[in-house]
């Protein structure tokens, strides 16, 4: 008999609130049950009866929202959930994914007791194998992060692997990671249990009911049109899995949801002669591209091949997902890998090769959050084959988002608004997911880049820079230079170099940083988001004063660095705004803020024809001229004095540069170094760049990339949104008090929260760490997410890091918390608490001593000095 995993999911008729939306199946003479009418209205309509939809409904009901209707076009748990391999793993690279998986594990563990529905939950533990030292380093990094959030795990030897799972061939292993509290479970039964609990709380569930389109009125969800009638609603949740892309387009105001399906294979065997114990650990052999779990005394094994098969590009998929065509030739490499890992499987009979579609996203992270174009339209899809692991936690965070207006954790890395509509091209998605699926098990070293779907958005200078040796990375679909390879460097060797240690581009970036310090460098920063806000009267100033925390009522020409805060005082954006005229403002934000910031501004801006918001990102090429000789270059090109006396810091002027007029020149560089940003109308971009490079030759000019920018800004303790700052970070927690108009009597979003925080104190503080006993040439490098220890106790994680070429040390930024030794509760973090601690940074299990600083290193260190001449212990913040 086929396993429950493949069997038809049993009906849910025992649950209150459950409705069959179609006649009961039976013989021709059977009595047909009359169709049940849908409610005319509800607060929330959830589309999708898989683990995501049922989890959202479950958590909404737990948070007090009872007026919820869940609609499923087929049968509950009959989509991807039905074919899920049932592996619950907490070992993830991203902190938010670790937290979602940990919550899911705890939820599923108690679900059977809560609902009475057997879910097959069995705590087996997981073993993650390493065939190479680099893979072991990757596991050690994950191990360090899991331990500090309370998930037990350890690095083990091949001998220990053999003890935990005697059937495994361990001769080629260098080590492994054991996570003892991981589990296996029947995903379909978990979905049914969640649905049952939601139904008992008042959620109404209807299967065999298809949503035709989502009705929108004035940019707000108004209801849904189904094949059985309309339901008026305030909120709609798209948990449609395979069908989410098409359903998004069926809205009266289309919603872009970038995901694409690929075929996913796994096999099932009959039991061993002596059946495997139910507690047999799950095995993940990423180097072999396979996973293995116990299944009814035999095994279930699948993987992520190098040459995946995209499916449903045309959008034609079934009402319910069926087992797709077997393809043993395609599965053969995974089967060979499986037999190498478990040679005794050769004698075991295979029951079936399962082929089911799985959805993948352009960046390997799931998609959740509210649509930027339709208020009240929420999305939870694109699990990249981790739906079971993420289902509980993701459903909880999305429900919090809907009920409270924000989730309890920072979920920006999963937010739908990290994508633009341009990333929803079917051709782009088809090509990208063919890369994404194998990447799930590929070794990902720091600073790796996607290779597909590139050159989607480029600066007008792209070809010019590419010809000069630019190496590129992608951000929000935009190509940005990382660094520039000198003619004498081996390009192929550099591109293929992947390491957790000192990278091959180290000396290249060092020379770019040196040029920024001593001469002049040019960085193309055209990808930055650029908005203009104008009005006929004072409307622009009034709304911006409310939306931003710093005072924007400044003289024309001044630039203000400011946060855009939420009601909790957290950063929704961190940006610079130049006042171009009394009624016009120019706003510069991080690249990935383009969709998010636009949606936030439109959410609060009144419908006033006299107030205009325009996205001008594409209108301007941005050149960042950094270094002490920028004054000479621009003076020669503009015939205008550029000294600080004539052009003070944080000032904006419209000037002529070369033959081009209308160049917005700003005295800032985003690095703390002297220089200017040039915002150039795109038709003049090539001319201005050529003129700058030509005149700059006598001053030692060269191109530079974002790696140099990163080193400069981290060394100067400049925090960036999306890396160091997020929606939970407040200005008071990162030294930004001076950029908040708390005492000016002007109301703004987040003001009350900041006033309260100022009175109560902060519970975490952004801190700069300078590594002391770290050998740059021999030791593993810090990148981000490394645990921070104070006096031997865990207090936080790094958010970003870079080698400081001036300090000749690694510099990390991260948040320090003060956990009570007795209760573990968070306490106020003071400057004294920071300064009196002895700190260590954990890099893949090895702790390195570090000096903590609350302020940038004094300016005397801006000149290159020998490491032994710099006594960091004698340095004090300003």
UniProtKB/Swiss-Prot annotation:
Name of the protein described by the UniProt record: Pyruvate dehydrogenase phosphatase regulatory subunit, mitochondrial
Organism expressing this protein natively: Bos taurus (Bovine)
Chief localization: mitochondrion
Gene3D superfamilies: Aminomethyltransferase beta-barrel domains, D-Amino Acid Oxidase, subunit A, domain 2, FAD/NAD(P)-binding domain, Probable tRNA modification gtpase trme, domain 1
GO molecular function annotations of the record: calcium-dependent protein serine/threonine phosphatase regulator activity
Subunit structure: Heterodimer of a catalytic (PDP1) and a regulatory (PDPR) subunit.
Keywords tagged on the record: Mitochondrion, Transit peptide
Signal peptide: none
GO cellular component, one term: pyruvate dehydrogenase complex
UniProt subcellular location: Mitochondrion matrix
SUPFAM superfamilies: Aminomethyltransferase beta-barrel domain, FAD-linked reductases, C-terminal domain, FAD/NAD(P)-binding domain, Folate-binding domain
